[in-house]
């Protein structure tokens, strides 16, 4: 049920459930603080991350067509956004991974140009960063795989119904490493990364592949099939 308050332009949504109900109000309170503001049961959380998973919603817009033919980054963002809603701890782990990755890339850039620290010191620091990157990356990839096990059968069944079985859809997680293998991969490519001056492996370089009759949809899917 949606209600519109024309005077205050404040839509409200109410979804009944047993034995209680949840009401969400979107608008501009009279005493709102400057900038972004959110509250749950009248109490504002100390951090925005605490709201993850509080307001699950399914939104479709034309930009979502890029999930099929766009860059892998968009598909990774799709996965990570869904997982932040499902698992409250995912966002914190993801942020830690990104922070360590940024530190690693900064170190690798300096290594490639010969700036700052001695080479041996850079190698030691790189090993420390890779250890943390592997720990966070393994946990995040596991969550991604678990989510796809739930999503793929439903998505493929829905597509089969829409296409009347004209073609078969499948979803595959294109991983750079098997579960438990990220630490070894980082060690194997450490020298290559030092020469390249950038990170070359990790979950930030993986992809979600959508296939139609075992062919990549990003190459062969029509506009209608993408929708």
Predicted regions and their residues:
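Extended, highly charged alpha-helical segments
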Residues: 62-138, 142
